[in-house]
């Protein structure tokens, strides 16, 4: 058993919600199990039959929409960018905006009962712009992958 599978979460859902603006049902990361700031992050999404998208996708044969797998990976990328900020930077004042997704590939369906492992790694960083590679895995098999570009920006004051 890998350390990522055996250890307690690095971030639980409450810690994740302090960083990401998403909320259920659109929060697609349940926990972070490994993080190396500036390098990589591994997160999980437990896919249950109670997911609202299964009502219409597809009745009688529920399959997680591929675009939501990509969204889960993008949320993991945002977590990695924020967790990679320096100690002098204020996490509460930052938000990550997705700029592009390239090379998306889907290998097999994700269904109720699957645990989606979200593996993201930094490819390149230039200032506030991040290029990351994301791979979604279920039971050791790649189910989706894509390249992401995002910008870490200041949140507007409300």
UniProtKB/Swiss-Prot annotation:
The keyword Lyase applies. It catalyses: a (3R)-hydroxyacyl-[ACP] = a (2E)-enoyl-[ACP] + H2O. One of its GO terms (cellular component) is cytoplasm. InterPro entries: FabA_FabZ (IPR013114), FabZ (IPR010084), HotDog_dom_sf (IPR029069). Keywords: Cytoplasm, Lipid A biosynthesis, Lipid biosynthesis, Lipid metabolism, Lyase. Signal peptide: none annotated. One of its GO terms (biological process) is lipid A biosynthetic process. Its EC number is 4.2.1.59. Gene3D superfamilies: Hotdog Thioesterase. GO terms for molecular function: (3R)-hydroxyacyl-[acyl-carrier-protein] dehydratase activity. The active site is at 57. It is found in: Cytoplasm. PANTHER family: 3-HYDROXYACYL-[ACYL-CARRIER-PROTEIN] DEHYDRATASE (PTHR30272:SF1). Involved in unsaturated fatty acids biosynthesis. Catalyzes the dehydration of short chain beta-hydroxyacyl-ACPs and long chain saturated and unsaturated beta-hydroxyacyl-ACPs. Belongs to the thioester dehydratase family. FabZ subfamily. HAMAP family: FabZ. This is 3-hydroxyacyl-[acyl-carrier-protein] dehydratase FabZ.
